[in-house]
Structure formats: structure tokens, C-alpha cells
Amino acid sequence: MPWEFLKKCDRQKAEVRGEKEEQEPVPGNPHFQVQFHVTSCRFAFLAFLAGSFLAFSLHALISSNLFWRLRQLHHLPTAHYLQTRDEFAVYSVDELNAFKEFYDKSTADSVGATYTEAEETNIKEALSSLRLAQDMYMAGKDDKAARLFEHALALAPRHPEVLLRYGEFLEHNQRNIVLADQYYFQALTINPSHSEALANRQRTADVVQTLDERRLASLDAKRAALSAIHEANSALRRAKKEAYFQHIYHSVGIEGNTMTLAQTRSILETRMAVDGKSIDEHNEILGMDLAMKYINASLVQKLEITIKDILELHRRVLGHVDPIEGGEFRRNQVYVGGHVPPGPGDLAVLMQRFEDWLNSEYSSSLHPVNYAALAHYKLVHIHPFIDGNGRTSRLLMNTLLMRAGYPPVIIPKQQRSKYYHFLKLANEGDIRPFVRFIADCTEKTLDLYLWATSDLPQQIPMLIQTETEAGEQLVKLQSPQMASIPESFYESGSGALP
């Protein structure tokens, strides 16, 4: 029998190797029961290991998601909240690398983004205008080229090619290297691998840094000149009083308050109501007055600013408008235009990081204007309150400036659109235009004080309001000296090469 012969051969081979032929287990046999028990134990042990591994993996995944959620909160690393934007403000050499690492949109998302039909139409028209603009520029028709570039930018404000070519036009034709550098930077935020934008940025970065440093040195010189004036100087005291009214008037005006400067002054001096104005508008002015007095009496002298100080500041800002919400973190999610602030559950962590940053050695090493502008942006970006975030942020900014010897900076309500535009640019990754805007406002405020305390025979600078054809209120300085300053000086981002 072939089959039996083969089995016999196998048994003989096993005996030669010294192996024992195992008897085939049969159900009911004790050997089968022992083997079944051992197999069950092995299965249970393997199941335990598999379950442990699954639980560990699930825990790691959840922890990782939580970590990355916090890490990517507002697209920035956990340990250094808004550190990337800080580096932009102080012009770190590594700003591009930091930007590429932490920017909120990946290269793939930016480059491979899909557009709606209307957006695609706008992009096609923008690129067509861009080609015409370049042709006009080559033909020497600079005015037409400038208008076509602006038209292309209006149609596609976030198209890398439009930003790049318009920046080159501004750099070489208009000699506005600061604005050109800003557009190169924006092009890189959308497409970090854009080689031409990167090459242009590397060429302009050092020049722009020099211009910005020169601007800050000019502010320091004007601050020193103002500090040299004795506090008992009557003109200085009158200027401070007038600036106090202006600061409150403009700060509430940015938020939509319709009170005029004269009405604001009347409310603060007489505490009498103004006919035809809402109670909330009155209370906003009174709240700012309380907050300013708190700063002068307490915060300016403090070595460190804490979360409690910021809450106390906000409590006074909303003290008359909404005393329940005043001094309290919001408990709901809010939306501010295209910006989505952090959820209420993240506010405590972010505000603690903000406090740590405010009082860190790194912050103390910044120029006071950079430091104050960054603090302003950080707080308004976190948006910790249900209302009054802008007013509280501007008050905090002025607290930091006053501690450094600067006067409270006035951000004119007429520049509200620029103010919000530069905040939007900061949200997109470049804080520098916002810092320059604050530097502009600081310089104008210093000029106002220096003019008021000069030996010129004219009266102190008063602000008058004139009505435009559209009924819009404008504020102008009654001053020959200020009138001699070119209009471009008042435009934010004035950094044209001399």
C-alpha cells in the first residue's frame, strides 16, 4: 500500500532525528483537553495584547489630535504663541523659514486651491490686465500701467503672479520698496515655493529693515525731545488735555460711535447727556474715561501687566454699557469678519501665554512701538471678550507706550478701514504693515505734542471737523507747520526710498 508505506517512512525519519511522533489529539482525550486549555490561554493573552495595543493607539491618537489642535490653534506653535509673527516684527533672518513651517495654509492647499466660477473669471481678467499693464510699462506709459496693475490687484488680490508683478512695478518704477516687499511677502504666503518672489524678497528685506530701523530711531529722537519739555509747561498740559479728548473720541469712533469731538468733550467735562444720541454711545465714552483714569492711576506704574489687569481694564470699558460681561471672558464662539477667534474653552490657556509673553525677556528686548503694536494685535486676535476687544487692545497698547515714555497714540477714526486692513494682513501672516501703521500714528501724535509746545505764535493744535460732500466728518489740524508736511506722510506704509 503506497500510503501506508509513506507513513512508515515518515515515522522512521522522525525516529532517526530523535523526534517523537505526536499522537493526534482526539476530543475527550486528556491530552486534547490540556492542549485546548493551553491554546485558550494563548488566545486570551494575544487578545489582551491586541486590546492593550488598540487602547494605547487610540489614546495616542486622541492625545496627538489634542496636541496638534492646540499646536495649530491659530496656525501657530503651542510653545510660542504668535512667535512667528513676532519674528516678522523684529525682522528675524529666519522669518521665511518660520513662516513656511507655521503658516496656516499648506503649500498644497495654497497652490492647488480650487476657485468658483466667478473667481476664475476674475483671475482670467486680472491676468489679462496684468499683461496689458506690463506692455504699457514697457512702452513707457507708467500712469496707464499703474491703473491696470491696481485693477488686476483688485480683481485677484491673492494671486501670486499679480502680487509679484505689481511689487516689481512699485519697486522699480514707483521706488516704493516697502510696499513692494509687502507684496512679495504676500505672494510667498500664498505660494512659499515661488522662486521669483523669494529672490525679490531676499533682495528687498535688508533695505526695508534699514528703513524701518531708521523710522524707529526717528521716533526715539522725537520722544526724547518731548521728554525734555518740563511737565509744568502750560502748552504741554493743554495739549495733553486735548489729546485725552481726542483719544477717547477716535477710539469709540472706530467702533461706530457717532458722537462728534465737541460732544465727546462736553460729556466728559459736564457729564450732561447729548440730545439725539443713544445711551450706549454715552456709556461707551464714560467707560473709556474710567479705563483711561485706571491706566494713569495704576497700570503705568506697574512693572508687569497681568491677566487680572487686562480684565480690570475691560471691566471699566464695559462698566456702563454691559456691567455683567465687563471683566469676564466670553462664553460663546464669536466670528469677526473672516477671522474666527479661538473657542471659549481655549481662552484661559491663550491668555496665560499672552501674559507670559507680555512679561518675558524677549518682549522687553523689542522696541517699545513694536512691543505695543504686537501686544495690541495679539489681544485683538485672541478676542477674549464678547465686546470691547478693540478698545481694550488699544488701551493696552497705550499703557505699554506710556510706560516707555511715549504719549497715548491716537488712531484716527478716519483711518478705520486701513486699521482693519492691516489687522487682516497680520492674520494672513505679515504683522509688519500693522506695526508700521502704529508707528505712523505714533509719529503723528508726537508731532502734535511737539507742535503744541513749540515757540510758534499760533494757538495750540486744535482739531476741527469739516463736512465732506458725502457728509463724512474729517479731522484736520489748524497748523501751518503741519500743513507743510506732504500728504504722503500721513499715508500708512510711506516707505519710499529717498
Swiss-Prot record:
Record's catalysed reaction(s): L-tyrosyl-[protein] + ATP = O-(5'-adenylyl)-L-tyrosyl-[protein] + diphosphate; L-threonyl-[protein] + ATP = 3-O-(5'-adenylyl)-L-threonyl-[protein] + diphosphate; 3-O-(5'-adenylyl)-L-threonyl-[protein] + H2O = L-threonyl-[protein] + AMP + H(+)
Regulation of activity: The side chain of Glu-255 determines which of the two opposing activities (AMPylase or de-AMPylase) will take place. In response to endoplasmic reticulum stress, mediates de-AMPylase activity. Adenylyltransferase activity is inhibited by the inhibitory helix present at the N-terminus: Glu-255 binds ATP and competes with ATP-binding at Arg-394, thereby preventing adenylyltransferase activity. In unstressed cells, disengagement of Glu-255 promotes adenylyltransferase activity.
Record: residues binding ATP: 255, 336-339, 387-394, 419-420, 427
Ranges annotated as spanning the membrane: 43-63
TPR repeat ranges per the UniProt record: 126-159, 160-194
Function field: Protein that can both mediate the addition of adenosine 5'-monophosphate (AMP) to specific residues of target proteins (AMPylation), and the removal of the same modification from target proteins (de-AMPylation), depending on the context. The side chain of Glu-255 determines which of the two opposing activities (AMPylase or de-AMPylase) will take place. Acts as a key regulator of the unfolded protein response (UPR) by mediating AMPylation or de-AMPylation of Hsc70-3/BiP.
Entry domain remark: The fido domain mediates the adenylyltransferase activity.
Name this protein carries in UniProt: Protein adenylyltransferase Fic
Species of origin: Drosophila willistoni
Top-level taxonomy: Eukaryota, Metazoa, Ecdysozoa, Arthropoda, Hexapoda
